[in-house]
Amino acid sequence: MTSTDTLLYYNTNTFSFVESTQSVQMTDAWNRFTSKLASSSLILDFGCVSGRDTKYFLEHGFKVEAIDGSEELCKAASKFTEIVVKHQLFQDWKSDSKYNGIWACSSILHLNKTDLKQVIGNIRDALLPSRIFYTSFKYGNFEGVRNGRYFTDLTESSFAELINEVTGFEIIEEWITSDVRTS
Protein backbone atom coordinates (compact mmCIF):
# COMPACT_ATOMS: atom_id res chain seq x y z
CA MET A 1 0.00 0.00 0.00
CA THR A 2 1.39 3.37 -0.97
CA SER A 3 0.40 6.96 -0.38
CA THR A 4 -0.94 6.79 -3.95
CA ASP A 5 -3.41 4.10 -2.83
CA THR A 6 -4.49 6.22 0.13
CA LEU A 7 -5.00 9.22 -2.15
CA LEU A 8 -6.97 7.03 -4.56
CA TYR A 9 -9.20 6.02 -1.63
CA TYR A 10 -9.93 9.67 -0.79
CA ASN A 11 -10.37 10.70 -4.43
CA THR A 12 -12.80 7.82 -4.96
CA ASN A 13 -14.74 8.26 -1.69
CA THR A 14 -14.76 12.06 -1.50
CA PHE A 15 -18.50 12.59 -1.18
CA SER A 16 -19.09 10.05 1.60
CA PHE A 17 -15.97 11.10 3.48
CA VAL A 18 -16.83 14.80 3.32
CA GLU A 19 -20.39 14.06 4.40
CA SER A 20 -19.20 12.04 7.40
CA THR A 21 -16.68 14.64 8.61
CA GLN A 22 -18.00 18.09 7.74
CA SER A 23 -20.46 18.42 10.62
CA VAL A 24 -18.32 16.75 13.31
CA GLN A 25 -17.77 19.18 16.17
CA MET A 26 -14.17 19.45 17.33
CA THR A 27 -14.87 22.25 19.80
CA ASP A 28 -12.57 21.05 22.57
CA ALA A 29 -9.59 20.57 20.24
CA TRP A 30 -10.32 23.82 18.37
CA ASN A 31 -10.44 25.74 21.65
CA ARG A 32 -7.23 24.17 22.99
CA PHE A 33 -5.43 25.12 19.77
CA THR A 34 -6.83 28.61 19.22
CA SER A 35 -6.41 29.62 22.87
CA LYS A 36 -2.66 29.57 22.26
CA LEU A 37 -2.91 31.94 19.25
CA ALA A 38 -3.48 35.67 18.99
CA SER A 39 -6.59 36.75 17.12
CA SER A 40 -6.05 37.06 13.36
CA SER A 41 -3.05 34.66 13.48
CA LEU A 42 -2.18 32.79 10.29
CA ILE A 43 -3.06 29.09 10.49
CA LEU A 44 -2.19 26.37 8.00
CA ASP A 45 -4.78 23.58 7.89
CA PHE A 46 -2.44 20.77 6.88
CA GLY A 47 -4.63 18.09 5.34
CA CYS A 48 -7.92 19.95 5.51
CA VAL A 49 -10.08 17.10 4.12
CA SER A 50 -13.63 18.55 4.02
CA GLY A 51 -12.63 22.07 5.07
CA ARG A 52 -14.50 21.77 8.38
CA ASP A 53 -11.65 23.10 10.51
CA THR A 54 -10.61 25.72 7.97
CA LYS A 55 -14.15 27.10 7.98
CA TYR A 56 -14.26 27.16 11.79
CA PHE A 57 -10.97 29.07 12.00
CA LEU A 58 -12.07 31.55 9.33
CA GLU A 59 -15.39 32.14 11.11
CA HIS A 60 -13.46 32.88 14.31
CA GLY A 61 -11.30 35.61 12.79
CA PHE A 62 -8.16 33.70 11.87
CA LYS A 63 -6.36 33.91 8.54
CA VAL A 64 -6.17 30.43 7.06
CA GLU A 65 -4.33 28.66 4.29
CA ALA A 66 -5.24 25.05 3.56
CA ILE A 67 -3.68 22.13 1.71
CA ASP A 68 -4.58 18.51 1.08
CA GLY A 69 -3.02 15.68 -0.87
CA SER A 70 -6.31 14.60 -2.45
CA GLU A 71 -7.27 16.66 -5.47
CA GLU A 72 -10.96 15.83 -5.02
CA LEU A 73 -10.94 16.79 -1.34
CA CYS A 74 -9.28 20.09 -2.30
CA LYS A 75 -12.16 20.82 -4.66
CA ALA A 76 -14.78 19.96 -2.04
CA ALA A 77 -13.02 21.95 0.69
CA SER A 78 -12.56 24.97 -1.58
CA LYS A 79 -16.27 24.99 -2.33
CA PHE A 80 -17.22 24.61 1.36
CA THR A 81 -14.78 27.21 2.73
CA GLU A 82 -14.82 29.63 -0.20
CA ILE A 83 -11.02 29.82 -0.20
CA VAL A 84 -8.56 28.17 -2.56
CA VAL A 85 -7.29 24.94 -1.05
CA LYS A 86 -3.89 24.02 -2.46
CA HIS A 87 -3.38 20.51 -3.80
CA GLN A 88 -0.06 19.40 -2.29
CA LEU A 89 1.43 16.10 -1.20
CA PHE A 90 2.66 16.37 2.38
CA GLN A 91 6.07 14.90 1.52
CA ASP A 92 6.61 17.57 -1.16
CA TRP A 93 5.47 20.54 0.94
CA LYS A 94 7.91 23.10 2.37
CA SER A 95 7.45 26.66 3.55
CA ASP A 96 9.51 29.39 5.15
CA SER A 97 8.62 30.45 8.70
CA LYS A 98 5.33 32.26 8.44
CA TYR A 99 2.60 30.38 10.30
CA ASN A 100 1.50 31.12 13.85
CA GLY A 101 -0.07 27.68 14.04
CA ILE A 102 -0.35 24.52 11.98
CA TRP A 103 -3.34 22.23 12.41
CA ALA A 104 -2.91 18.64 11.15
CA CYS A 105 -6.03 16.87 12.36
CA SER A 106 -6.04 13.20 11.35
CA SER A 107 -3.95 13.90 8.29
CA ILE A 108 -0.29 13.06 8.77
CA LEU A 109 -1.30 9.74 10.34
CA HIS A 110 -1.34 8.44 6.75
CA LEU A 111 2.46 8.77 6.48
CA ASN A 112 5.01 6.11 7.37
CA LYS A 113 7.40 6.95 10.21
CA THR A 114 10.24 8.01 7.90
CA ASP A 115 8.01 10.44 6.03
CA LEU A 116 6.48 11.60 9.33
CA LYS A 117 9.89 12.72 10.59
CA GLN A 118 10.58 14.66 7.40
CA VAL A 119 7.12 16.27 7.29
CA ILE A 120 7.14 17.21 10.99
CA GLY A 121 10.57 18.77 10.44
CA ASN A 122 9.15 20.79 7.54
CA ILE A 123 6.20 21.82 9.72
CA ARG A 124 8.63 22.98 12.40
CA ASP A 125 10.52 25.05 9.84
CA ALA A 126 7.30 26.66 8.58
CA LEU A 127 6.25 27.88 12.02
CA LEU A 128 7.12 31.18 13.59
CA PRO A 129 9.04 30.87 16.89
CA SER A 130 5.85 30.23 18.91
CA ARG A 131 5.58 26.78 17.24
CA ILE A 132 1.94 25.93 17.93
CA PHE A 133 1.29 22.63 16.18
CA TYR A 134 -1.73 20.38 16.63
CA THR A 135 -1.85 16.86 15.27
CA SER A 136 -3.82 13.72 15.99
CA PHE A 137 -3.31 10.03 15.45
CA LYS A 138 -5.23 6.84 16.03
CA TYR A 139 -4.06 5.26 19.29
CA GLY A 140 -1.84 2.20 19.21
CA ASN A 141 1.26 0.66 17.68
CA PHE A 142 -0.12 -0.30 14.28
CA GLU A 143 1.61 0.72 11.05
CA GLY A 144 0.12 -0.45 7.77
CA VAL A 145 -3.06 -0.75 5.73
CA ARG A 146 -6.47 -0.56 7.37
CA ASN A 147 -9.76 -0.02 5.51
CA GLY A 148 -8.02 0.80 2.23
CA ARG A 149 -5.70 3.45 3.67
CA TYR A 150 -2.22 3.53 5.19
CA PHE A 151 -2.04 4.45 8.90
CA THR A 152 0.65 5.03 11.48
CA ASP A 153 -0.90 4.76 14.95
CA LEU A 154 0.97 6.19 17.93
CA THR A 155 0.90 6.06 21.72
CA GLU A 156 2.09 8.79 24.05
CA SER A 157 5.56 7.24 24.21
CA SER A 158 5.92 6.59 20.47
CA PHE A 159 4.70 10.14 19.72
CA ALA A 160 7.20 11.60 22.23
CA GLU A 161 9.97 9.50 20.66
CA LEU A 162 9.03 10.79 17.19
CA ILE A 163 8.93 14.42 18.34
CA ASN A 164 12.27 14.06 20.15
CA GLU A 165 13.88 12.71 16.97
CA VAL A 166 12.70 15.74 14.99
CA THR A 167 13.74 18.29 17.68
CA GLY A 168 12.51 21.84 17.98
CA PHE A 169 9.18 20.92 19.55
CA GLU A 170 8.00 20.54 23.11
CA ILE A 171 4.81 18.63 23.87
CA ILE A 172 2.77 21.10 25.92
CA GLU A 173 -0.50 19.24 26.00
CA GLU A 174 -1.57 15.72 25.14
CA TRP A 175 -4.89 13.97 25.55
CA ILE A 176 -6.76 10.89 24.42
CA THR A 177 -10.28 11.01 23.00
CA SER A 178 -12.49 8.48 21.32
CA ASP A 179 -12.64 8.52 17.55
CA VAL A 180 -15.37 10.70 16.11
CA ARG A 181 -15.43 8.37 13.12
CA THR A 182 -15.53 4.60 13.00
CA SER A 183 -12.98 4.08 10.22
State where each predicted segment sits:
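A conserved beta-strand element that flanks and buttresses the S-adenosyl-L-methionine
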Residues: W103-A104
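Helix-to-beta-strand junctions that scaffold the AdoMet/dcAdoMet cofactor pocket
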Residues: N112, L127-P129
